[in-house]
């Protein structure tokens, strides 16, 4: 898998390190950068709490920047006001598969002597000005969780263009906890199960899976403790398993096919929304969007989900809050609720249409019919949402 990824990114295999989860890759990168207590990391206020946690594990401070409502990426014009003498890193996230304007972020970083980390957990397969996501800044990290275009059930990896960072990450990789037999069996079981879940079974399957993982009864994207407090689990710093490597080695070959499928589905959704006079997601000229998720703003999210549940339509809920999926007691994770109004408002109204490889022609037709039936529950634009709230 390391060799295949190196070939995909046109880098040396020594520049790639493999992990149990993407968040472990981020932790290793921050550690390699010698991030410590008191250091500040700038990141978008529209992310997952498991991205925030590694910052807190090292005693550093996450500093949140509001988002651009068109791209759902960090608003570059608001970064400067967040920089202090303690700022060390800007975390540049590819939200839903869309790269931010990295040239502008790198200009800011150069001005203040900061490191830019590309958060490509959504962005595998996309590009910025023709360059693959993850290959612009000195270092990047990726997630290979089950809902990503390149998946090893769970997992992650880092790509470092900086030789010193690559060496440190390789040293840390040798220190990672080795997955046990239970981990190997769990990966194989989840891979088998996911391949067989149809859209009709999506809601009961996802509800059961989330409940089991929240209560630490099954391996999930996030365990219960990670969502309750920023205390690093004992087995957090874990390496990739043999089962993940075997799956990943096969799946790399299919990445282009998977991403082309997502783009094709997104184009159908674009056509639908334009026909309904609803603004489709913004696609800037500088980036190739891979549409990990297809975002849509709705008037009443709970009601919309209930309708989808009833009609057996798959929908996603990224992001329920600026630090998804946490929806209360934000100060536990150092998030200052009320300071990022755009992200906070969007996170109350956003849903995602699926673009994954399970969406065949029949399911696509069902989703389109569902959207047409419920068009009155969808905002035509971000500005309409703001005016009505």
Predicted regions and their residues:
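Short beta-strand->loop structural element characteristic of the AMP-binding/adenylate-forming
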Residues: 61-71, 316
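Phosphate-binding glycine-rich loop
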Residues: 2-40, 49-58, 64-66, 131
């Amino acid at each position: 898998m390391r060799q295949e990824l190196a070939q995909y990114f046109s880098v040396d295999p020594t520049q790639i390190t493999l992990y149990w989860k993407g968040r472990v890759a981020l932790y290793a990168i921050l550690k390699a950068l010698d991030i410590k207590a008191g250091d500040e990391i700038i990141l978008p206020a529209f992310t997952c709490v498991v991205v925030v946690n590694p910052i807190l594990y090292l005693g550093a401070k996450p500093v949140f920047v509001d988002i651009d409502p068109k791209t759902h990426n960090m608003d570059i014009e608001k970064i400067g006001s967040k920089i202090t003498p303690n700022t060390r890193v800007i975390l540049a996230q590819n939200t839903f598969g869309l790269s931010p304007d990295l040239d502008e972020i790198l200009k800011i970083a150069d001005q203040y002597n900061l490191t830019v980390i590309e958060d490509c957990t959504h962005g595998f397969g996309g590009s910025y000005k023709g360059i693959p996501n993850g290959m612009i800044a000195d270092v990047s990290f990726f997630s290979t969780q089950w809902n990503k275009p390149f998946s090893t059930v769970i997992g992650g990896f880092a790509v470092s263009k900086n030789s010193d960072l690559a060496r440190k990450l390789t040293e840390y990789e040798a220190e990672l906890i080795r997955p046990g037999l239970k981990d190997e069996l769990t990966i194989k079981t989840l891979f088998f199960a996911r391949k067989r879940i149809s859209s009709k079974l999506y809601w009961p399957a996802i509800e059961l899976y989330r409940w089991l993982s929240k209560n630490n009864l099954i391996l999930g994207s996030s365990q219960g403790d990670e969502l309750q407090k920023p205390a690093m689990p004992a087995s957090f710093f874990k390496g990739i398993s043999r089962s993940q490597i075997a799956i990943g080695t096969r799946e790399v070959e299919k990445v282009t096919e998977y991403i082309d499928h997502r783009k094709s589905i997104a184009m159908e959704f674009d056509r639908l929304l334009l026909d309904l006079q609803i603004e489709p997601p913004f696609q800037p000229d500088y980036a190739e969007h891979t549409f990990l998720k297809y975002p849509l703003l709705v008037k009443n999210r709970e009601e919309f989900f209930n309708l989808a549940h009833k009609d057996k339509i798959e929908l996603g809920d990224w992001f329920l809050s600026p630090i998804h999926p946490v929806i209360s007691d934000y100060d536990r994770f150092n998030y200052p609720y009320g300071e990022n109004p755009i992200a906070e408002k969007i996170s109350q109204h956003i849903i995602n249409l699926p673009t994954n490889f399970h969406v065949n022609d029949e399911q696509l037709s069902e989703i389109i019919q569902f959207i047409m039936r419920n068009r009155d529950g969808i905002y035509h634009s971000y500005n309409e949402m703001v005016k009505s709230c």
